[in-house]
Amino acid sequence: GISKNFITCLNEQLENHNPLIGREMELERTIEVLCRKDKNNPLHIGEPGVGKTALAYGLAARIEAGEVPERLKGSRIYELDLGSMLAGTQYRGDFEQRLKSVMKSLSAEKKAILYIDEIHNLIGAGQIGDGSMDASNMLKPYLEQGDIRFIGSTTYEEYNRYFSRSKGMVRRFQQIDIQ
């Protein structure tokens, strides 16, 4: 489907990535949050270049090696390419359609985890032309059902400027500081 243009399965990209080193605490915390009943979506917050994306790959590697709790075994992590998803969307409806199709194909899959780098861009994303749209509202049903788990990443600055303003997102994501 269309959505495969906007997501990459990290589990299938591992051979192109170096193993994660020195992030065991953050990785354990991420796994712990993903296994909880509530507020089970980790949000990695740290300065640019500290390795937030590397953590998502590190988790995919642990899943592939079977070194995760039963609840996460067999999970697949997909990275959302927000840039290409927003590219060429002249109308907010275009962006909404793309996001919906991604979410739909992920819900059909068991144990999908969607990694969204620079997740603050979803808050107020698609404010194209005069109609403003908050894409985080489109994620809320999925966040509530819990059939798709999310991992977000952002910087402290963007968190404070955008993410912290969305009470619904703050309520569903658990902050994990990446130093």
Predicted segments, located by residue:
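Conserved AAA+ ATPase "SRH/arginine-finger" region at the nucleotide-binding site
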Residues: 174-179
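Short glycine-rich substrate-engagement loop in P-loop NTPases that contacts/grips substrate
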Residues: 78-107
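Walker A/P-loop
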Residues: 31-72
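Short regulatory helix/loop adjacent to the ATP-binding pocket of P-loop NTPases
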Residues: 127-129, 156-172
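N-terminal pre-P-loop "Q-motif" helix
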Residues: 2, 18-30
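Substrate-engagement module of ASCE P-loop NTPases
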Residues: 100-109, 134-149
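Sensor-1/coupling segment of RecA-like P-loop NTPase cores
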Residues: 143-161
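Walker B catalytic acidic pair
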Residues: 117-119
